[in-house]
């Protein structure tokens, strides 16, 4: 079955990652959304950054707690009955969480729902000549986005929004065509990507970030 996008993918973490690895993956991405890095950014970037933070928080909520993580891993079929990691090609098409685990306004759940539905559609329509619905990729970091489109065989055109970008992972803030427009397999998807601006004296990566408690 076609590999699905998981909560782990949204954090750029592996299913066998330790709790410390999960925390570090979250902190690395959330650190790029700090207010001082967003200062002066266009309003649409601020809006999408809030969506991105919601996606990260949703993934963190599921994976930071051992009980919820185990329940998710089992529901998503990431581990076999013997406790071994399932091969990527055997991942289920669905997202792995029942609807009751999703808040209606949860952006992370919204992303997984959309990508999970697309995976199901692709499993049923494998003909490369068919048109596929474009997923909503706004709020994904660029490395996560590449993982998504790599599974869809879409051709990507990258538009850099920051004149002197900091050498860190960028944030997808807009796309063309918009979701859920249908395009041909191997069709072109254009994304606009924002990076924090580099310092005038030289680009510098973001400072370490520690996640505050969620309320």
Segments (PLM) and residue ranges:
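N-terminal J-domain/J-like co-chaperone modules of DnaJ/Hsp40 proteins
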Residues: 1-46, 55, 121, 131
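Amphipathic N-proximal alpha-helical interface segments
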Residues: 178-203
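BRCT (BRCA1 C-terminal) domain core and associated BRCT-interaction motifs
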Residues: 156-183
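Extracytoplasmic
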Residues: 129, 172, 186-188
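Glycine-rich loop/hinge motif
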Residues: 121-162, 200-215
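Post-J-domain flank of DnaJ/Hsp40 co-chaperones
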Residues: 8-9, 59-62, 70-125
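Sec-exported extracytoplasmic/periplasmic mature domains
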Residues: 27, 31-35, 61-68, 150, ...
């Amino acid at each position: 079955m076609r590999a699905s996008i998981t909560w782990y993918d949204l954090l750029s973490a592996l299913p066998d990652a330790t709790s410390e690895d999960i925390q570090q993956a979250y902190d690395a991405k959330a650190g790029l959304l700090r207010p001082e890095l967003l200062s002066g950014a266009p309003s649409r970037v601020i809006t999408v950054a809030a969506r991105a933070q919601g996606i990260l928080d949703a993934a963190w909520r599921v994976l930071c707690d051992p009980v919820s993580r185990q329940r998710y891993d089992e529901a998503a079929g990431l581990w076999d009955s013997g406790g071994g990691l399932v091969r990527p090609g055997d991942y289920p098409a669905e997202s792995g969480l029942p609807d009751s685990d999703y808040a209606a306004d949860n952006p992370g759940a919204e992303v997984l729902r959309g990508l999970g539905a697309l995976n199901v559609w692709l499993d049923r329509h494998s003909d490369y000549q068919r048109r596929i619905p474009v997923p909503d990729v706004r709020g994904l970091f660029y490395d996560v986005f590449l993982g998504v489109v790599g599974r869809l065989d879409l051709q990507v055109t990258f538009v850099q929004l920051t004149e002197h970008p900091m050498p860190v992972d960028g944030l997808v803030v807009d796309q063309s065509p918009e979701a859920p427009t249908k395009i041909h397999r191997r069709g072109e998807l254009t994304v606009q990507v924002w990076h924090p601006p580099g310092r005038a004296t030289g680009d510098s990566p973001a400072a370490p970030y520690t996640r505050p408690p969620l309320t």
